[in-house]
Swiss-Prot record:
The active site is at D12 (proton acceptor), H40 (proton donor). Binds 1 Mg(2+) ion per subunit. GO terms for cellular component: cytoplasm. InterPro entries: Adenylosuccin_syn_GTP-bd, Adenylosuccinate_synth_dom1, Adenylosuccinate_synth_dom2, Adenylosuccinate_synth_dom3, Adenylosuccinate_synthetase, P-loop_NTPase. GTP binds at residues 11-17, 39-41, 304, 330-332, 412-414. Mg(2+) binds at D12, G39. It comes from Methanosarcina barkeri (strain Fusaro / DSM 804). Pathway: Purine metabolism; AMP biosynthesis via de novo pathway; AMP from IMP: step 1/2. NCBIfam families: PRK01117.1, purA. Keywords: Cytoplasm, GTP-binding, Ligase, Magnesium, Metal-binding, Nucleotide-binding, Purine biosynthesis. It is found in: Cytoplasm. The lineage of its organism: Archaea, Methanobacteriati, Methanobacteriota, Stenosarchaea group, Methanomicrobia. GO terms for molecular function: adenylosuccinate synthase activity; GTP binding; magnesium ion binding. This is Adenylosuccinate synthetase. Pfam families: Adenylsucc_synt (PF00709). The gene is purA.
Length: 424
């Protein structure tokens, strides 16, 4: 069985929590895109794990894989492995595999990313972690791959080949080109290469072999649908494809092998950084949602902008991903709000729309059309079953399900592993 999980909004939907919940039924969990510009927070008991590269399935018995569509900062990977080992969780080559073709984020990528963002008159909200520049080099065939990182001779030869051009690019951006051949940084990367040598694998072959043997494989996305580099709200997007089809392309698995595509959907909507958010709540109500939901980025710490549930954006996400089921998160955060609003469409230049316009600039001008539902006052964080929810909370979930026309199978009412239940 092959299952793909993606975020249906702008990221931060709670993918890590749901992956952690479901991973017990899977033999392999694989990350297929992005880098350490995304973050998952998983709570197990009193322990909190903040992950940026290693798939959330690491906390259970699954083998976890990092596919070749990821851009990997080896320093971040080393820190995550050390964090787990500090908690008594061994992350050896039997537990974690990294594809030999995975692109490496070099120190100069991070430098160039920061310089470019600072030079923009209008910021796009990059995390300045070198993600975009690593993807640029992948497309330009100027990348470093994991296979080169773990081979000192190849690594140094590749650096000599690429260094002159990278030094020129950094100088053009107003930076110090010495970072490209900094001896201390080179030595550190060679050390990291030795550390990761045993982790190298062929992710496509490993996943296809597992599927042939009847095993269960989960592909885990980072970010969210509307941050997709092609279909998202350009230019306020990430540098990779975040939708379900990307899992097949990046992991090297044929689309006919996909059995399920699960959407992770927040009961409201949030966005980090710049870009349109038609239902955005400003002032006291927006701050209340932000505080109640703990809406601060795992990666950047930036406060997330909050808004009411946006159905047109969800309709587009459903079309782009082909979802078979939905996991609804953070329902508890809406407690105490009355009414609770659902954006069912937009008005744009005198027209009524039930689907987002193609251009980002047009989406920014859309005004939401709302349907109001009565709220509830009961704390939901101890609820263990759908029938235990207050009537108005159940009605809200049912109405979302009706509007999205995709079944909601799981509901989350808190950050802990035990605070998610199946809707039956």
């Amino acid at each position: 069985m092959f299952t793909i999980i993606t975020g249906a909004q702008f990221g931060d939907e709670g993918k890590g929590k749901i992956v952690d919940l479901l991973a017990k039924d899977y033999d392999i969990v694989a990350r297929f895109q992005g880098g350490n510009n995304a973050g998952h927070t998983v709570r197990v008991g009193n322990e909190v794990y903040k992950l940026h590269l290693i798939p959330s399935g690491i906390l259970l018995n699954a083998r976890v894989l990092i596919g070749p569509g990821v851009v990997l900062n080896p320093e971040v990977l080393a820190k995550e492995i050390a964090m787990f080992e500090k908690h008594g969780i061994q992350v050896n080559a039997e537990k974690l595999g990294v594809d030999a073709k995975t692109s490496i984020i070099m120190p100069y990528h991070i430098e160039m990313d920061g310089l470019r963002e600072e030079s923009r008159e209008k910021k796009i909200g990059t995390t300045k972690r070198g993600i975009g520049y690593a993807y640029i080099d992948k497309v330009a065939r100027d990348e470093f791959r994991m296979a080169e990182l773990v081979d000192q001779e190849r690594f140094l030869a590749r650096l000599e080949e690429l260094a002159p051009q990278k030094e020129k690019e950094i100088a053009t951006l107003g930076g110090d080109p010495k970072i490209v051949r900094d001896p201390a940084l080179i030595e550190r990367y060679l050390e990291l290469g030795k550390q990761f040598a045993t982790y190298i694998t062929d992710v496509s072959r490993e996943i296809n072999k597992a599927l042939d043997e009847g095993k269960h494989v989960m592909a885990e996305a980072a970010q969210g649908t509307h941050l997709d580099v092609i279909h998202g709200t350009q230019k306020f997007v990430t540098s990779s494809s975040t939708i379900a089809g990307s899992a097949c392309a990046n992991l090297g698995v044929g689309p006919t092998r996909v059995n399920n595509v699960i959407a992770i959907v927040k009961a409201y909507i949030t966005r980090v950084g710049e870009g349109p958010l038609p239902t955005e709540l400003t002032g006291e109500l927006g701050e209340r949602l932000q505080k109640a939901g703990g809406e601060f980025g795992t990666t950047t710490g930036r406060g997330r902008r909050c808004g009411w549930f946006d159905l047109p954006l969800l309709k587009k996400a459903i079309a782009l991903n082909g979802y078979t089921e939905i996991s609804l998160t953070k329902l508890d955060v809406l407690t105490g709000l009355n009414p609770i609003r659902i954006c069912t469409g937009y008005t744009f230049k005198g027209e009524n729309l039930d689907y987002p316009p193609e251009l980002t600039a047009d989406l920014a001008e859309c005004m939401p059309v709302y349907e109001d539902l009565p709220g509830w006052e009961t704390d939901l964080t101890e609820v263990k079953a759908f029938e235990e929810l207050p009537e108005n909370a159940r009605n809200y979930v049912k109405r979302l399900e009706e509007l999205m026309e995709v079944p909601i199978n799981y509901i989350s009412v808190g950050p802990g592993r035990a605070q998610t239940f199946k809707k039956e």
